C-alpha cells in the first residue's frame, strides 16, 4: 500500500511540476548528472522550454549525488557554467582559498552545498525539475520524442538529451555505441565522514576482510616495499590519507585510490538486478575501509556524516562511475587528437576544454598489469569537438555526460567534472538552437553554438593567454577555432597547458 501511495504522489508531483509548461517541452533532459544539469540550465537560458528528470532528490550527479565533491582539473580554465558554479562555491565559503581544504584538489565542498548551488542555478534559469522520478519508455515521434515517466506521466519533446551517469538513455533509444572498451574503470562508492569527537560504535560490515585495506597507507600492517605497497602505489601517512579529501567544513571525503574504496566490476554489462547487488557489495567494500580506519588505525571517532546525504545509511545516492556507454558520434575525440590537435579539423568545432591527465583507475581489476600503461598518461590541455554530443544516426537526440563519443583511453580525461560540465553546457546550447530552428542537431553549424558559448564566457580552446572577461578573449578564441592562431600544448606533471604565446620565462 505504501509503495502505491508513493507512486501516486510521484505522479501528482510530476503533473504539478509540468503544469507551468504543459506536457510538451522543447528540450527534455533525462538524468541530472553534472552534464545533464548544465545542459538544462543552458537550454533554458537560451529560451527553450526545458525540463529535467532525475531519479534522486539532487542535481549534479558525480559532483553531488555520488559524493565526489573535489573537482579535478580546469582550475585555470574556469569559464561558463563551471566557472559560475565554482564562483558560487567560493562565495559560500568565503573565497577560493577556503576551497583548498584538501590536497586532492583546489576546489572542495560539501556535496549538499553543491547540490543547493546547482538547484538554485536551475530554478533561476526556469528549468522544470522533476526529481525523485525516472523515465520508463521512449517513443520516437515525427517531431521528436514522447517519454513516459514513472507513474505514467508523458512528456513530448523536440530534443531529448541523455544526462545520465551511464548512458542509459542512449542505450534505450538505440543510439550506435563505440565498442572499444577493454574493461570498465574501477568505480568508487564514496563516503563523507566526520569526526564526532568521541568513539563511534562500529559494526563489522558483512564480508569484512582487513587484508583488503592494510596497504592503504603507511602503517605497521602494510607491506612496505621502499615506500610503496605491492601494487606500486606510494604509502602515504595516515594523516595525509585523510587530509586528501578534507572538505572546507571539516568533513572528509573518502575517495582514496590506494587499496581503499575503489571497486572493480563490469557494471556496464550487468542487468538492473545484477547492478543492484554490485552496488550493495561496493557499499560494503567502502564500509569495510571505514571499519578498518576505526578499528585498526585508531580513528574511532570517525563515522558516516549524518548531515550530508538524506539517505537511510548516510551514503551517497549511487557510486562514482568513471565509465559509461559511449555513443558513436559525428566526431570522436581520441588521445591522438589531444596530443596532436592540428592533425585534424576537430579543433574548429571545439566547445569544451580540459587539462587533466589520462586518469584511469584499474588497480582493483584482475587485469591491471595489462592496463598499466593507461595510468596518468601524459597529454596537453585539450578541446572537445561538438560532434561528440551528436549520435551519427539517432534524430532529435544528444548526450551531455560521460556517454560522449570519445575513445576509451581518452575517457580517462573527458570523464572529469569540468569537462562534462562544459560538454553539458554545449549540449544545452545546441539543443535550444535545434529546437528553435527545427533543425536536427547535426545540421546546426558548430559556429552557432560557439557564438553562444562565447557570449556566456566559455572557453572553446584551452589557451591560457587570456581568460573570460579579459579584453581580446573572444577574439583569440574565435581566431583559434578558425585556425588563424594556434596554441602550443605541453604536459608538466599534473599541470597540462596550452599557450598561443608561451610565457617569456619558459
Where are these regions (language model features)?
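Flavin (FAD/FMN)-binding glycine-rich loop and adjacent Rossmann-like elements that form
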Residues: 21, 62, 115, 153-159, ...
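N-terminal Rossmann-fold NAD(P) dinucleotide-binding loop
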Residues: 36
Amino acid at each position: 500500500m505504501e509503495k502505491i501511495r508513493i507512486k501516486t504522489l510521484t505522479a501528482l508531483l510530476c503533473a504539478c511540476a509540468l503544469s507551468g509548461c504543459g506536457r510538451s517541452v522543447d528540450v527534455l533532459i533525462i538524468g541530472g548528472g553534472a552534464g545533464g544539469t548544465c545542459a538544462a540550465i543552458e537550454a533554458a537560458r537560451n529560451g527553450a522550454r526545458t525540463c529535467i528528470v532525475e531519479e534522486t532528490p539532487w542535481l549534479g550527479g558525480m559532483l553531488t549525488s555520488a559524493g565526489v565533491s573535489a573537482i579535478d582539473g580546469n582550475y585555470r580554465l574556469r569559464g561558463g557554467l563551471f566557472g559560475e558554479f565554482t564562483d558560487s562555491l567560493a562565495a559560500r565559503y568565503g573565497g577560493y582559498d577556503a576551497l583548498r581544504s584538501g590536497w586532492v584538489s583546489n576546489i572542495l565542498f560539501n556535496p549538499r552545498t553543491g547540490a543547493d548551488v546547482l538547484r538554485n542555478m536551475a530554478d533561476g534559469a526556469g528549468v522544470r525539475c522533476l526529481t525523485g522520478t525516472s523515465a520508463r519508455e521512449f517513443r520516437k515521434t515525427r517531431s521528436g520524442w514522447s517519454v513516459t515517466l514513472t507513474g505514467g506521466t508523458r512528456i513530448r519533446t523536440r530534443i531529448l538529451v541523455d544526462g545520465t551517469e551511464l548512458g542509459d538513455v542512449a542505450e534505450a533509444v538505440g543510439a550506435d555505441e563505440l565498442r572499444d572498451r577493454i574493461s570498465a574503470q574501477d568505480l568508487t562508492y564514496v563516503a563523507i565522514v566526520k569526526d564526532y569527537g568521541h568513539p563511534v560504535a562500529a559494526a563489522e560490515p558483512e564480508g569484512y576482510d582487513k587484508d583488503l585495506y592494510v596497504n592503504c597507507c603507511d602503517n605497521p600492517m602494510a607491506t612496505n616495499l621502499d615506500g610503496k605497497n605491492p601494487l606500486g602505489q606510494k604509502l602515504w601517512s595516515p594523516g595525509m590519507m585523510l587530509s586528501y579529501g578534507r572538505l572546507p567544513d571539516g568533513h572528509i571525503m573518502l575517495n582514496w585510490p590506494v587499496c581503499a574504496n575503489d571497486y572493480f566490476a563490469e557494471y556496464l554489462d550487468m542487468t538492473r538486478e545484477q547492478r543492484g547487488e554490485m552496488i550493495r557489495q561496493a557499499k560494503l567494500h567502502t564500509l569495510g575501509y571505514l571499519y578498518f580506519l576505526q578499528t585498526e588505525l585508531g580513528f574511532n571517532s570517525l563515522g558516516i556524516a549524518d548531515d550530508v546525504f538524506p539517505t537511510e545509511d548516510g551514503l551517497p545516492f549511487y557510486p562514482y562511475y568513471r565509465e559509461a556507454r559511449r555513443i558513436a558520434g559525428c566526431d570522436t575525440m581520441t588521445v591522438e587528437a589531444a596530443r596532436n590537435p592540428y592533425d585534424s579539423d576537430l579543433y574548429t568545432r571545439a566547445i569544451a576544454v580540459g587539462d587533466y591527465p589520462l586518469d584511469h583507475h584499474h588497480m582493483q581489476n584482475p587485469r591491471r598489469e595489462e592496463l598499466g600503461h593507461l595510468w596518468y598518461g601524459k597529454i596537453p590541455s585539450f578541446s572537445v569537438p561538438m560532434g561528440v554530443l551528436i549520435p551519427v544516426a539517432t534524430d532529435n537526440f544528444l548526450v551531455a555526460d560521460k556517454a560522449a563519443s570519445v575513445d576509451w583511453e581518452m575517457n580517462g580525461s573527458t570523464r572529469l567534472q569540468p569537462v562534462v560540465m562544459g560538454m553539458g553546457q554545449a549540449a544545452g546550447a545546441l539543443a535550444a538552437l535545434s529546437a528553435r530552428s527545427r533543425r536536427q542537431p547535426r545540421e546546426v553549424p558548430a559556429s552557432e553554438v560557439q557564438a553562444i558559448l562565447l557570449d556566456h564566457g566559455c572557453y572553446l580552446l584551452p589557451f591560457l593567454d587570456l581568460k573570460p572577461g579579459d579584453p581580446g578573449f573572444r577574439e583569440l578564441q574565435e581566431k583559434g577555432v578558425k585556425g588563424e592562431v594556434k596554441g602550443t600544448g605541453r604536459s608538466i606533471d599534473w599541470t597540462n597547458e596550452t599557450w598561443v604565446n608561451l610565457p617569456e620565462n619558459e
